Structures are given as structure tokens and as C-alpha cells.
Amino acid sequence: MKTSFSIQAWEEYLYFQTQDKKTLKKINELIKDIERNGALNGIGKPEKLTNNLSGLYSKRINDKDRLVYENDFIVILETVKFFL
């Protein structure tokens, strides 16, 4: 299965490479897990998104960040950061 990143996701991925190795490690684990187990199985509490995000899936990176991706072709759209 091929993995690619949107421009925004790639910029965030590069940020994590220099600023947050723990999060980067988790993102890499999630990508490998998606390749092995598919979109709705495995670690990270996989979730099928709805409404305007229909057709996309997410997995938890940590309590506040999510990895958002497509199913058949892993396209990392973004790592969503939720701020309270």
C-alpha cells in the first residue's frame, strides 16, 4: 500500500521530526498499522468520519491530535490538532 501526504500534512510531519519525536514515533506506528490492518482496525481507536469528511478515517495520535487518512490509498491529509 502506498502512502502519500498532502502538502499541509507533510509540513506537519516535518515539524514533528524536529520538534516532537514522541508524536512522530506514534504517527509512524499508526501509518504502519494502517498498512497492515486496514482503515478500521488496529491501534489508535480508528473511526470512520461523517458529514463533510465522509470517506475519510481518523486514528488518535494522542489525546488532542488525530491522523486523518483515506482508506484504500493511504493519503495522510493532516494531523488534526484540537485546542481547548
Language model: regions and residue ranges:
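Conserved protein kinase catalytic domain
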Residues: 10-13, 31, 50
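PIN-domain endoribonuclease scaffold, especially VapC-family toxins
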Residues: 24-32
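A short, surface-exposed loop/turn module that caps and links secondary-structure elements
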Residues: 33-60
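Basic nucleic-acid-binding interfaces
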Residues: 2-4, 51
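Enriched for short, Lys/Arg-rich terminal
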Residues: 2, 11-24, 58-66, 70-84
